[in-house]
Amino acid sequence: MHPIRKKRLTIVLFLVAGIAIAVGLTTYALRQNINLFYDPTEIAAGNAPVDVRIRAGGMVEEGSVSRDTDSLKVNFRVTDYAASVPVQYEGILPDLFAEGQGVVAMGRLNEQGVFVADQVLAKHDENYMPPEVAEALERSSKGQHKSADVEKAAETTAY
């Protein structure tokens, strides 16, 4: 093999190897930051992974919010009207957090089936609902009746 061709081949091989390593590291880094969305029906059915960071969303079940008087711990249930999931959160809740309102919580599901949230997001006006929550409610039994709130939420997709 001619020395110039050998040198070019070596350079090309190093470039291909470098690009492959960069793509592999980027894919690994992005995989660590993906938070998949699960609705309460999927979580209750056991389809959500345990001890993996996920997002769970739905409506805060009426009468389910209980606050610890000595700390910032809050327990509540998130429902899609077909199933509900208990959620534990320690921290300051958003001002718009209320029973009967839409929320998206980020955290991990423990072995007992309790979603331990480290972040809770509440909707920002009376018509908005996160698209994932609107879809989950639409798929649930109440969603088959197409309530006016779910229809409005499905139309409003701006964050």
From Swiss-Prot:
Keywords: Cell inner membrane, Cell membrane, Cytochrome c-type biogenesis, Heme, Iron, Membrane, Metal-binding, Signal-anchor, Transmembrane, Transmembrane helix. Residues 30-159 are periplasmic. It is a single-pass type II membrane protein. The chain crosses the membrane at residues 9-29. The keyword Transferase does not apply. Residues 135-159 are annotated as: Disordered. Residues 1-8 are cytoplasmic. Heme binds at residues 124, 128. Residues 136-159 have a biased composition (Basic and acidic residues). One of its GO terms (molecular function) is metal ion binding. InterPro entries: CcmE, CcmE-like_sf, NA-bd_OB-fold. It comes from the Bacteria. It is found in: Cell inner membrane. GO terms for biological process: cytochrome complex assembly. The keyword RNA-binding does not apply. GO terms for cellular component: plasma membrane. Belongs to the CcmE/CycJ family. Heme chaperone required for the biogenesis of c-type cytochromes. Transiently binds heme delivered by CcmC and transfers the heme to apo-cytochromes in a process facilitated by CcmF and CcmH. This is Cytochrome c-type biogenesis protein CcmE. It comes from Marinobacter nauticus (strain ATCC 700491 / DSM 11845 / VT8).
